[in-house]
Amino acid sequence: LDDANIDYVGVMAFPSRKIVGDVTEEYTIKVINAVRDYADRFAIIGGVEVNELSIDEVKYWLNKQYESGISAIKIHPVHHWVKPNAYRPEEQNLKQLELVYQFAEDHRLPVYIHTGTSMAPKARNKYGDPIFIDDVSVDFPKLTIIMAHMGRPIWMSTAFQLVRIRPNIYADLSSIPPKKMLEYVPRLAEISDKAIYGSDYPGPGVYDIKANLQEFLKIPIPNDSIKKIVDDNPRKILKPLSRNR
């Protein structure tokens, strides 16, 4: 991190039974404990697999992860096989998911929601459409929502419009190759107040955090827009472990 001139990074540490196997809510706690001595360098994003747990279990794990110091919550519809708006009565009426959003709103935790496709063999990509997040934005207006990957590669226009019209929806740019960023998001500068840099390391095609960041810094948009995306906005939204409970 020092070599890349990065103060701290966000680490996704959420359960994934269907895709990875025996990776449960306890995994979040293990990751937090592993980096506790470097709490100023890491922000841990936890989560619960809402369609695998009872309401009481969801409450238990949310509280335990919060007390341990999570900086945000991650929902992965494509890997968890659930719509982001599945709590709605006309959808699945999944109270466990509603509880997650309410908890995050009450505790001022941002929520990352995966959008776009996944190459995982058991992924259900139909759940990656960002339009389902629109309901969440309306129903939880005080919740900070971060659309991970901005719907890439097939729903990016939908994601862009949601960032523009919904004040509590932000765009996470991770996993979009910096060299192709303006092909995917040609009007990136217009949403620089609501966009957040990310690498998705060690995800597909991302082999080095420093190299990825350096490529991003070369994107031909105004310098103040770059600074907002790589520095100002992440610091505002995602706090390191040392700043939490």
Enumerate the language-model features and the residues they cover.
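Alpha-helical elements of Rossmann-like donor-binding domains used by nucleotide-donor carbohydrate transfer enzymes
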Residues: 30-33, 60-64, 99, 132-135, ...
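N-terminal cationic-hydrophobic initiation segments that often serve targeting/anchoring roles
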Residues: 1, 35-39, 137, 163, ...
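Short glycine-enriched loops at secondary-structure junctions
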Residues: 50, 152, 202-203
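Active-site gating/metal-coordination segments in enzymes
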Residues: 7-8, 16-119
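Mid-to-C-terminal alpha-helical segments outside catalytic/metal-binding sites
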Residues: 1-8, 68, 191-194, 204-245
